[in-house]
């Protein structure tokens, strides 16, 4: 998972990812490169969207797809670390439930409460 390091640019944390290479470097080096260098190295470090907003978007995207595994749990924890409050998570999940589905919201709430 991404590790945060401070940078001087706009005081936003720099995301550094090595999990792709660690898990798949020998088996799928192109995928590992895209995961570590493009998704996290470039996309997550693009400062046009702040990390808090980016975390919210990611949680909503996973929720809307019905992905409730460890990746959603990690992204909920990441959202909390980047300033998304418990009340904001509850309001976001409630709002998205009307568009993505009630059962998906229940699954997210079960993870978010942990």
What are the language-model segments listed below?
Residues 54-62, 92-93:
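Short, structured motif recognition centered on aromatic/hydrophobic residues
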Residues 64-73, 102, 106:
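Short helix-capping/linker segments at secondary-structure and domain boundaries
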Residues 70-87:
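Mid-chain, well-packed structural core segment of small domains
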